[in-house]
Structure formats: structure tokens, C-alpha cells
């Protein structure tokens, strides 16, 4: 079985104005994460080279904050061009919050293949986890990305206290968007976060993967944050459940498994890794 690997570069971290209860990058909570306004381009390129060495096809440039402004847009475009020049065979993904059609067209010109902007959860449950912006504004950014000609990467977070009805509603909204890829994150509580809920079981997490693939058969289901913690020794069962991709290495503010360990285990299990996008 061939699967797709993606890596993340957190190129602007922390001090986000938004109050998303699940996020350690919010300025509304005190956490000990690294905070920086921008990462050096040379460091981003180095991380891209490491990602490629570890069999990644996708490389995501992530910035904290509500959305793109002129300065941030210019910086992300610079980063994309720098990576493209040195590692031309990576698929570049941008994850920079709210964005207009015009801004997203600029990202596409700079070499961005796909835009990631998660709905996070259902329209009904969203006000319980964020009050500083609306679910509708997130949905609109996804429509903007499609209009700009970008591929769409849109998913969310499970295990925040949402109901099964919320999960169904959330997946129906994703069906409207028909994203190229749909990331699944499993919420991991942090003592500094306002959101304190029981962790998902491995069985429940695998059911979420199956239900997502059933709802979105044409989308690449990508399991991202929380994979190692929630699923532990069962984490590679996600592929039998319908996943076609994982995020390798460090996540935004938490440690993932060392990429090489994932590669070793997956190769032992007979998996091969996508080197181009079909």
C-alpha cells in the first residue's frame, strides 16, 4: 500500500489573538511553547530538506494568527520560493488562517499547491471552543481557496467534547467542500488550556477515521496531531481504517515521533511512500 507523508514547519509561532480553547498558541493562555514572529528562511529550507529525506511529499508552512496581512503574505511567499528553489519536488501547503481570494492567488503564484484551513468541528459546536471568530469565516476561506485555484486541505479536531451529532454535521460540511485532503487531529489536553475533557480511546479514534473515509471517499484522509498519544501501539491500524496519509515528525507545539522511526516501522510493514501527487 502506498501512503503519503507530510511534514510541518511552524514558521511563525505563538501570540495568536484568537481564543481557541484547544490551542496552546493562543495569547489567551500561558504556555511554555516557543514564540517567534518568523523563522529564518535558511532554517525553513533545512527543515524541508529533512522532510524530503524522510520521504515526505507534502511540506506545510504554518503561521499562527487569525489570518494573512500584507507582511505575512510576503513572508510566506518568500519561504515558498526559497523551498521550491532548493527542494523542488515537495508539494507545498500553506496554513495561514483567514485569507481572501486575492491573497490566496498570490500564494499559488509563489508555488503553493494546497491551502489548509480546518473547520475544526461542527458549525453548532464551534462557539463553545472559540468566540473571537466564526465558523462561517473559516468555511468562507475554504471557498476562497478553491476559487483561487488551490487544492484544499480541510479537516479538524476530534475529542473536544463534541457529540456524535456534531461529528456527523462536521463531516457533512466537509462533504460540501470536497477537500483534496482532510486531516484528523485527536485533541490532547494541556494543563494550561481551558479545554479539559477525557482523551479519546483508540477504538473511538479508529472509528472516526473509518467514518471520515466513508463520508469522503475521494479525499485523502490524513491522521495528524494526537496519533501517537491516542493510538499508541495501534497507530498504524489507521491505514486499514481508511487513512492514506500521516504527518511525520514534530507537530506545531508538541513532539511527534521521530520521522525516521515512523519510516522504519512503515517500511517493515510493507508500505511505500508517494513521491508525486495523482
Curated annotation (Swiss-Prot):
A Pfam family matched in the record: BATS
GO biological process, alphabetically ordered: biotin biosynthetic process
Catalytic reactions on record: (4R,5S)-dethiobiotin + (sulfur carrier)-SH + 2 reduced [2Fe-2S]-[ferredoxin] + 2 S-adenosyl-L-methionine = (sulfur carrier)-H + biotin + 2 5'-deoxyadenosine + 2 L-methionine + 2 oxidized [2Fe-2S]-[ferredoxin]
EC identifiers of the protein: 2.8.1.6
CDD domains, per database record: Radical_SAM
Cofactor section: [4Fe-4S] cluster; [2Fe-2S] cluster
One Gene Ontology MF term: 2 iron, 2 sulfur cluster binding
Keyword Ligase applies: no
Residues the entry annotates as binding [2Fe-2S] cluster: 60, 95, 153
UniProt pathway: Cofactor biosynthesis; biotin biosynthesis; biotin from 7,8-diaminononanoate: step 2/2
PROSITE patterns assigned: RADICAL_SAM (PS51918)
Family: Belongs to the radical SAM superfamily. Biotin synthase family.
Name listed for the protein in its UniProt record: Biotin synthase
Lineage of origin: Bacteria, Pseudomonadati, Campylobacterota, Epsilonproteobacteria, Campylobacterales
